Amino acid sequence: MGRGTGELGRAERLPVLFLFLLSLFCPALCEQIRYRIPEEMPKGSVVGNLATDLGFSVQELPTRKLRVSSEKPYFTVSAESGELLVSSRLDREEICGKKPACALEFEAVAENPLNFYHVNVEIEDINDHTPKFTQNSFELQISESAQPGTRFILEVAEDADIGLNSLQKYKLSLNPSFSLIIKEKQDGSKYPELALEKTLDREQQSYHRLVLTALDGGNPPLSGTTELRIQVTDANDNPPVFNRDVYRVSLRENVPPGTTVLQVSATDQDEGINSEITYSFYRTGQIFSLNSKSGEITTQKKLDFEETKEYSMVVEGRDGGGLVAQCTVEINIQDENDNSPEVTFHSLLEMILENAVPGTLIALIKIHDQDSGENGEVNCQLQGEVPFKIISSSKNSYKLVTDGTLDREQTPEYNVTITATDRGKPPLSSSISVILHIRDVNDNAPVFHQASYLVSVPENNPPGASIAQVCASDLDLGLNGQVSYSIMASDLEPLALASYVSMSAQSGVVFAQRAFDYEQLRTFELTLQARDQGSPALSANVSLRVLVGDRNDNAPRVLYPALGPDGSALFDMVPRAAEPGYLVTKVVAVDADSGHNAWLSYHVLHASEPGLFSLGLRTGEVRTARALGDRDAARQRLLVAVRDGGQPPLSATATLHLVFADSLQEVLPDITDRPVPSDPQAELQFYLVVALALISVLFLLAVILAIALRLRRSSSPAAWSCFQPGLCVKSGPVVPPNYSEGTLPYSYNLCVAHTGKTEFNFLKCSEQLSSEQDILCGDSSGALFPLCNSSESTSHPELQAPPNTDWRFSQAQRPGTSGSQNGDDTGTWPNNQFDTEMLQAMILASASEAADGSSTLGGGAGTMGLSARYGPQFTLQHVPDYRQNVYIPGSNATLTNAAGKRDGKAPAGGNGNKKKSGKKEKK
């Protein structure tokens, strides 16, 4: 079979690739691929391998997702091979009509990256249509008087094919009276005319039947036939004659129905009824109407240039005798700008990434205007200020691409309006709008609402309580804007961080894992991070400083005097002759809190003799308020309370035992009668003390024996005289509880003589000793502790002399309140430096005071009767100076210079004191 019988599978397919380079500013290379195929190819037929022609490999096809974008689905692309396949019937006559060239243009779309490729498939005509007449038979009346050579226009056949496959010629069945003449119109179409070869005789043959055949130029040619019936009429000498054989006129397509197109006119030289001419269309017209009397042709319907550009009609003029004349009327329709351009989007991206680079392809725009000429020339523009632009890709085809940076956080979507305007007069335009949504990318890091955070948390907070909350916002969407919180770093120990704080990843709330202690941890800093869930994730850090607020959770601690298990201190001795204002002792306390919570005040809760003593509210100094009366008891008891400034205040109490006496002998009964405080670990300590005592006794016996043997050999009698009966004191230092552990920021360790456990050994000194001779008992530090006094003292071994005024403190050197002392109570210490060893020895020696005239309380020049007293009250902000913790008991004694001056007054002699004591003994 030939091409006309459907051998479409073997038709040639000639793919031709054309590459059209756009300007350098075009972001992509636009390729146009041309194919040529015959019409009526069966579905599934291969047009060509589109992937190969585009340079795609088979491996790329799954990712590139090559597909066809067109208004009608004539073609499709195989996802496996990339071949362009026929998907619907291709009828050239239906698609293009009588156009000499028929091509289907569409776009091939490839993704990753997105690009468009123009494809042109030319549809070749095949001889699949036969010429057809509108009717199977036609009737024609010819007068017997018609002269040979007279021509009659016959019905034309229609062939939908073009070119050689269209109608090419006509054939007429053989008849000696008629012949066939073929003529051609201006558009190239052919029509037949019947020519009379000889005169007809109606009396011989009144009816003729002829067969008219129309043939195309196909191979083999196709044909169509119609029967021509000729009726011979009676003679009419003069037939009608038209003014012109062909009437041509141009008509605008926008004329309304009823518009007069033209008027045909014919004349007949006959008279009477034979000269009356009536006009009619040779073929029935539907668009135009003809006035049979006047020959006026008018429009019957609205004309449309886009449907039919030209009309050709045959008008007959028939006289009353039956003679007929024919003329041709050709009406050319002029195009008017009556069609607005049509704008359509193809392969529009639903979402555009906000980080798309300028020039990213968004959509393909197709412009179509049914008008022709300038009326069909269209200009496309983008309305408004948007970060997009349109680029001409081919005729009536544009690309919509990005023309700037996109930011979804500022503009999440764009309403893009594209206007197409033709060049008609007046120009027509149409617009189409589309909303382009911007897809979010993780381009915004979380931002904290504050540059840094500072919170205050009171101590002793409940574990698990929230102490702070941070908040960060992320302008992105979805996971890109979902923020989680964590602790990145801190100034705490890494291992201890988890035991202090934790953080909620969702809410940003920071929780305390434990109760904070202001005395252990006053402040700490955390580095918090907010991180989104994007890929890659973005984060931001912020510092959170936590200040632990102090609460009054620590009661004052009494450091001095050292308290026993029952809360009472050992006795302090006050001279009977003490004047009002005499400094008896000083209560020293500290508070581990700070601020007002550590501001201590001292109060007397109970006194055995009210009004006898006064207590400094802030200094804690216990002074005599008046002189001792005859009715006043020698032993006094003061219950002192130390309160802090917290709300509510916390307090501690201390019981002071004060004894008015001038010598230790007066208070010995009180000392021996006083019960020894019980020790919780007395049993264990007892065994330890016994063991140590045995070892010490054995060692001392060995040393004494060695010294005695050596002195036996010595010739110095003075050395032996020291071992004569006299006064020797053995005392053991007692260390109060250690306050270095706990919540105090500073440690206070005191070493004082525990007078309750002091032992006295009375030895009789040798009378051979000179009054100026003293035994030096001490270490290399130079501290002098005389055990044997001058001969003057031996005359009254049982008397206690009052302390020497040379050892009294000056007003400027008295201990006072730290931090907030009055100007008159503030003084500086002497410039001479005391070694640590000397002070320790002085403190230990203060517990050993002689009971007779040779005791350290006498008025001898070498006397150093010392008792440890803690210095001024200290708060947590001051570190105590150990030099302030020593003063002379029994009086306001102060260390003086060699001249013995104290505050501008001459010191009282020691001998006078001794005489006064002697008088008391005599009484």
From Swiss-Prot:
- Name the residues that span the membrane: 688-708
Q: Could you tell me the membrane topology recorded for this protein?
A: Single-pass type I membrane protein
Glycosylation sites recorded in the entry for this protein:
N415, N541
Extracellular domain ranges by topology: 31-687
- In Gene Ontology terms, what is a biological process of this protein? homophilic cell adhesion via plasma membrane adhesion molecules
Q: What job does the chain carry out?
A: Potential calcium-dependent cell-adhesion protein. May be involved in the establishment and maintenance of specific neuronal connections in the brain.
The protein's matches in Gene3D superfamilies, at most eight in alphabetical order, are given as:
Cadherins
Q: Which residues form the signal peptide?
A: 1-30
Protein's name according to its UniProt entry? Protocadherin gamma-B5
One matching Pfam family is Cadherin
Q: Which sequence ranges are listed under topological domain Cytoplasmic? A: 709-923
Q: Where is the composition biased (Basic residues)?
A: 913-923
Write out the ranges of the annotated region (Disordered).
Answer: 794-832, 893-923
Name the SUPFAM superfamilies for this protein.
Cadherin-like (SSF49313)
Q: Where in the cell is it found?
A: Cell membrane
Q: Which InterPro entries match?
A: Cadherin-like_dom, Cadherin-like_sf, Cadherin_C, Cadherin_CBD, Cadherin_CS, Cadherin_N, Protocadherin/Cadherin-CA
To which species is this protein native? Pan troglodytes (Chimpanzee)
Can you quote a single GO CC term?
plasma membrane
Residue stretches making up the Cadherin domain: 31-133, 134-242, 243-343, 344-448, 449-558, 566-671
Q: Which UniProt keywords apply?
A: Calcium, Cell adhesion, Cell membrane, Glycoprotein, Membrane, Repeat, Signal, Transmembrane, Transmembrane helix
The Polar residues compositionally biased stretches are 807-832
Report a single Gene Ontology molecular function.
Answer: calcium ion binding
